[in-house]
């Protein structure tokens, strides 16, 4: 589908963004292992999260789903059934990587695959550490590409040092460790999204988290983990599109309601504040294990900044739209230490640089990020999402301040993480 967007005279509105994608995945995957039933509201009914539900159903988990409400009938830590067919994760890297950990210690064989994009993405980052724990995984390119074959076996505890800051790798290891024969200690680069740690602790798992290590004690009691009913907060990665839209527009005020403010996810807010954005956070509260609030951003001038180091794990998915903010800012912005961008749904360094260049921005790709000159005026153009949901939405935001019309190919990609994106897009322009 092609979507045509154009310059907006002003932007106004209050938006409830869909539920957090990371938490939605975990809410169904973890509750499938619980002894009992869980009610989940605010669930993101995007294509990726629906892939997690589909895979769990193939292993005997009963799940009722209607819009943003889900009920999971847990089967217990060792109650999953061997699937009779290949588990298709669609385009969802989270589904594949978390299931790889979850299934590593289950007493059966399983095969994980996905669409062409997912099958092309490297998987050694999870396969190698899981193998070190005793897991038996194989796949194309010596396990670096899906389909992945998992022969469930005994997972060994012990010490493992994480070489990269990745919530998916960390989560895969912790899920494998739930069925382990001894405690697991993770050290190294453990600072990344911590939804897994928060949720497992809330479900009664003996997990200790310190600045330099995470220690998991496999549950010895048969009723652990407990089921966890929860409301999923709004996704800060989705909210960032509206934060940037407001920040780059001279006549804008947009509020995102009920957004998750977990410190491991608020890197984009920190960057926008450093760039000079006018941001107000109100109605702060806790919902379950997660901090939540309302975020209002008003239009104003931005300046260039540097995005690197410990910031990267806190905003890796938001870099495409932050690049739009940087293109509209005064001065240079440097993105570094973000090699992971090249292993996403697309090579997001290459796609961001090519598509924003087509709109008149000045960018230079680097091995681990990009350099954005800033200061230019964006022009409408015919651009490609490359089937990547975050690229499609970033280009739509750029189109709000570009002169003339912008035509986005494969605009339907937004449904992966934000099924109502185009409705909300029209809403803020019409307000």
From Swiss-Prot:
Gene3D superfamilies: Enolpyruvate transferase domain (3.65.10.10). GO terms for molecular function: 3-phosphoshikimate 1-carboxyvinyltransferase activity. One of its GO terms (cellular component) is cytoplasm. The active site is at 317 (proton acceptor). InterPro entries: Enolpyruvate_Tfrase_dom, Enolpyruvate_Tfrase_sf, EPSP_synthase, EPSP_synthase_CS, RNA3'P_cycl/enolpyr_Trfase_a/b. Its EC number is 2.5.1.19. Keywords: Amino-acid biosynthesis, Aromatic amino acid biosynthesis, Cytoplasm, Transferase. Phosphoenolpyruvate binds at residues 21, 93, 121, 168, 348, 390. Pfam families: EPSP_synthase. The keyword Nucleus does not apply. GO terms for biological process: amino acid biosynthetic process; aromatic amino acid family biosynthetic process; chorismate biosynthetic process. It is found in: Cytoplasm. It catalyses: 3-phosphoshikimate + phosphoenolpyruvate = 5-O-(1-carboxyvinyl)-3-phosphoshikimate + phosphate. It is an enzyme of class 2 (transferase). 3-phosphoshikimate binds at residues 21-22, 26, 166, 168, 192, 317, 344. Pathway: Metabolic intermediate biosynthesis; chorismate biosynthesis; chorismate from D-erythrose 4-phosphate and phosphoenolpyruvate: step 6/7. Catalyzes the transfer of the enolpyruvyl moiety of phosphoenolpyruvate (PEP) to the 5-hydroxyl of shikimate-3-phosphate (S3P) to produce enolpyruvyl shikimate-3-phosphate and inorganic phosphate. Belongs to the EPSP synthase family. Monomer. This is 3-phosphoshikimate 1-carboxyvinyltransferase. The lineage of its organism: Bacteria, Bacillati, Chloroflexota, Chloroflexia, Herpetosiphonales. The gene is aroA.
